[in-house]
A protein has these predicted regions:
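N-terminal helical cap/lid subdomain that shapes the substrate entry/recognition surface
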Residues: 1-93, 100
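Asp-based, Mg2+/Mn2+-dependent phosphohydrolase catalytic module
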Residues: 1-2, 96-99, 112-202
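Generic structural signal for small/hydrophobic residues in well-ordered secondary structure
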Residues: 7-10, 49, 98, 107, ...
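Hydrophobic residues in well-ordered beta-strands that form the structural core
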Residues: 14, 107-109, 183
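Short, charged helix-to-loop "capping" segments that act as catalytic/coupling loops
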Residues: 16, 81, 110, 114-118
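Short, flexible loop segments at the rims of nucleotide/cofactor-binding pockets, characterized by
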Residues: 81-86, 109-110, 139
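Conserved, well-ordered alpha-helix/loop/beta-strand core segments that scaffold catalytic motifs
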Residues: 103-104
């Protein structure tokens, strides 16, 4: 049976809003542009659990000439997780329709443990048989190992998986392994892409 494998950030949830990024920058105590650069500089290592929450935020702090207290790290982590929880209504509608039609659904997302925990608590998480996060795999997209570990969890061959992700490099990496892959732009286009492969939402 075919699996529909969704990315989370930028697909199920909205990208971080300007307001959320501004709140994070203010909490960081540094200039917004410098904070933004440092936030992403170490993100992949944070996503794949090479850095824990304290090590990640202290790396960011060091770039800004600061050192964060435990309460400051807790607040930054809270703001960070919250910034990834605004769902895209069209995608949620697509997910509920696919689930109602009996399709098997899973998530593969690059995310640190705090964000993954927050996503698991969302009602939409209940539609997925598996929620797979890079922090648990200790490997992140677009690394082939990340996809291969996910296929093993799904007990699926690449040809049995349709993958949707907003990042072109992740889509390309999945395609190399043999998955049917689409770059996500908006829910109606994703619905049409899936329908062309015989996956219709109820």
């Amino acid at each position: 049976m075919t699996w529909v494998l969704f990315d989370y950030g930028g697909v199920i949830c909205e990208p971080q809003s300007e307001a959320d990024r501004a709140r994070l920058a203010r909490a960081s105590g540094g200039p917004a542009a410098d904070f933004e650069a440092s936030y992403w500089r170490y993100r992949l290592d944070y996503d794949r659990a090479a850095l824990d929450v304290t090590a990640y935020w202290q790396r960011v702090a060091a770039d800004l000439g600061r050192s964060y207290s435990d309460p400051e790290i807790a607040e930054l982590s809270r703001l960070d997780s919250t910034s990834w929880l605004t769902l895209q209504p069209g995608t949620v509608e697509l997910i509920t329709g696919l689930a109602a039609a009996g399709h098997r659904l899973a998530v593969l997302s690059n995310a640190p443990a705090d964000v993954a925990e927050a996503v698991h608590a969302l009602p939409v998480a209940g539609y997925f048989e598996h929620l797979v996060f890079s922090c648990a795999l200790k490997s992140a997209k677009p690394d082939p190992e990340c996809f291969q570990a996910t296929l093993a969890l799904l007990r699926a061959e690449p040809a049995d998986v349709i993958f949707l992700d907003d990042r072109r490099d992740n889509v390309a990496a999945a395609a190399v392994l043999g998955m049917v892959s689409f770059q996500f732009t908006e829910a109606p286009a994703a619905r049409a892409d899936l329908a062309r492969h015989g996956i219709a939402a109820g």
